């Protein structure tokens, strides 16, 4: 009998992979058995992730799907879109629990992959089996899930901000705008012109402003909750932080509501959720990703401008945690029957 | 006969005051004759503004309204709201040209001061005489203007983003949201809990999210252009930059429009405007305040998400320049019959 | 029999206090029983430390020394210099273990308090009893210590960089310069002109450059190791980070030494030290505080310029962790007979 | 007769090239006639430098040395080391004034190129003709100079900090350490792993710490001033700013000197220098690059720790201005008989 679940991290040299390692290295019920990287195979993991010096002594290996089941019981795929889908069927056949952090299994409707991702999905049947790994919405389904499609970060921020609103149907259902501000780690570990420090620092730069892909999964999830077709436009902006994403979800109230009523609807919706914190205070009245850095929390709050019936809900996350690796481990924990917060009792840094 | 117009800067120790000095010290047609500061009277200006070491040898003085006309022909008031209004009438009587950078003369309707600023305006007649100092909208009125009410920075960003849209009536007129992201210099030179570096850096922090005051002047100006009542909600967010403000003005198109048509409407609206640059490109497709830092430019651009008829117009400014001191000098230049860009041929820094 | 040691944090609203709480809230063998703040007494701790929302439900209280022994077994004093010394004698009499994070008990020679801190030390006998809380140098003395004087951050960085060098006597003993670069959190939570975000961000600002106080404790500790009088000049510089301190300790080799020999001397000196990591690599060849953020690690490395016999040793710490709260808990753990890393198995964030 | 000197900028797409354009576009006596870029030939300059939108309408071209004399009277070479040297002889033959911003003509001793730059210099005779373009040291030689070797940024900062010290021989001549802190723009416009925003922001990262190349030119210039062999070790550190370099030059006084005497020696050395500002004040007592951003100023100051005879001189520059493009234009102005500050009356931004 094994003491610990052996986990593999595929794509371990990127930021999401690195964040998975940061979490899993102190997870009480897992043992990191394999860390793959095509680019750095054979090199020490801590060479690429100097934060892990002295904590992980493994080297990166090439990903060998044939031997993976000898070494791992569960596998996290931190790979680009369009790559994971080639591995998932076999990994499932081998009996591994698969947590995929790409978009490859997030959408239920295969047609949407053509529209938003420019490819024909080769395994549409797996889309039905995959569970969208947002535990606040899919807790029960995640139990014993074998294929978890971990949400995108801007989608997570947007969905968490809007879910209580669409569930309670207090706003115009066709006019949701999620204006998202994100740190630079969201773009991954690969350098580019736009991520070059002198270009990226001090930028307040809209990007993918004409139709951000995460709208597809956000609409899927919000429509499910609303039991209606929800349209949402996500407009992301690169700002100077490294970690953090704030969604400012602007909507229009259809009826007058007191603030306390809105507060109650949101609080009720998220009652008992381990990683949701509802913000309402006088010193720090709104969510700010600064206060969740390093943790799996999502802070949710709102503001109303009554004279024109504008409601904005805010959600603040650490894009690498609740927006990626943290949420993946949270969903994994549920699927394995662990405590939801195993490995995730990480307290946000302050100041950071 | 004087060679140069003598100008006084009242409230010269703050950031807006300092930025006026940075501009005026190389302005070809002005001479800085008086710089006041209650707090630093008697001390060298360059003690507080070390960037001006070797460039300005004046000391700060106390503001003495009785003697000001001996020393200055024009005066810039960089004072808090509710202070300038006490000085303006006398300064006008003394024959000075007054450029007020506070909100005290921006609104035409005195009732709005009660609602938005919590005071009864003591000189409602002056509100009629004051010219709202946004030269792109009020060029003709600014000629020979004696009292210029220089716009707020978030208002400037919002108005410049939305003016061509409301002028051409292509969107829903009741649902404008200007989601603004601003640098820390917008809060002024006085330290506070929220501006403390460890608190402010990496923040993505909504503030005044339930009714930002600049909405009042933005609605006034946009309604004038639209010849209709325009409602706009301004939701500002503090981000990590020092300088820069980006307004992302989200609206809903009422008719299908090709991008080129939208581009033409915006370009036509701003044709010939010295400090407006229309952005449409493949490497940097949208405005970013990063590319106007240190200059008086406002970069304007847009994005359309056709499937849901969402139009976002962006405007990017340096909040201390086009959002404050630069715009004030631009309006002053017009009022004095100078070239619109005297003292303002400042090229944006890159990278910055 | 108590399950957990009850700990009080006095001065809990500052950054060091907050960092102690971040650590102690997940410490397996302690229970936070009292958190004091003169300024915020009666208010929820999470109001001031929003990162701790949902994690700590205590309110701040006023510090009442008379009742403290009913509530706490150990006490952390996160107070300004000159304040702790008034409380320590009574707290010791009451039987509490005292961990003082101020400078009040760091120096053995009471004369030095007059020179460096401008006060006459009222309890010179306690200076003998206090243990300087740098576990890498005082591990044995810390066992059962009742009064721990936790080191200053710039002193910690300087001592850790130079200890192996002075121990092995390979350099000129009179010419040590520790050029330190530090983040803004080192200045504490109280806003000031210099910490105002627009002033502090992008600063590369020398401060206390004519005799930094931490030299006193660094010289005390380094002289003890060297068994000789060591002089060291600490020249700190404020840079843009929030967390992190790097000491670049410049020295002059008295004999030619191969790099491998220097490496061995440093590695030998720190053999078996839980929180020291010796850095020597090709991608990240020198220590950088970036890779220890959020953790108690100190990364140590060096560079030699042979042609002129210059040796620089570098040490990188998180100033709030190994430079303050983390080191305090580390020393506390040793004094209590706990594992040295209880509560400190915190993995550095990356990227951060 | 030409009204303006026609200038070409070769390598116009990088940061130094861009900064030259920012300066030259408002220079009263030059006309930018050619801007070359191998990578972007045919594309608008403002596509790569969005700050220059509306200010420069030229496209980049390929560099054609044969036709350059038809189009330009002077040429700025903003090219990598080892490239300029191939063009310079022909350009000089063609009668152009050549300002080279690489290291290719900075060193007088050709042997040093083998040691520090790993190449044999093909035109050692030109090294004699080239003038090291630091106007504070070579003003007279720069008049009518045809080949100007513009200094490196870390060398400029180091030389300016140490020149008055070595000239007056008040310190140990063998033990100079210039601990330099620099912003990210110093690394140029090309992205790399180390310049990736999530890696570079918040870094306090030593680099080239075992023998920085700029020591060669610094030692050449300082030895010339001292009329003695000066050794200096330059240890650069990457910090979070975009622009700015601070050299903290640590030295050991050989005699006791009052601060006022040191101040006088420095002030005397730099008397009448247009771009040098000597810093001595109570609010901002030391130089900080923050206060020269965007300008050609170098701020010089110092600190003494008398008890151990340590003297640190500081120099603060904008690495793209006084450290590169600004200084190049300053030297060019002198060579052409223009005012030293033509095009350089740029006031530092504050805050920035």
From Swiss-Prot, chains A, B, C, D:
Catalytic residues (positions): 153
One of the GO BP terms on file: L-arginine biosynthetic process
Uppermost EC category: oxidoreductase
EC assignment: 1.2.1.103, 1.2.1.106
Family annotation (Pfam families): Semialdhyde_dh, Semialdhyde_dhC_1
Function: Involved in both the arginine and lysine biosynthetic pathways.
NCBIfam families: argC
Family to which this protein belongs: Belongs to the NAGSA dehydrogenase family. Type 1 subfamily. LysY sub-subfamily.
Name of the molecule in the record: [LysW]-L-2-aminoadipate/[LysW]-L-glutamate phosphate reductase
Lineage of the organism: Archaea, Thermoproteota, Thermoprotei, Sulfolobales, Sulfolobaceae
Gene responsible for this protein: lysY
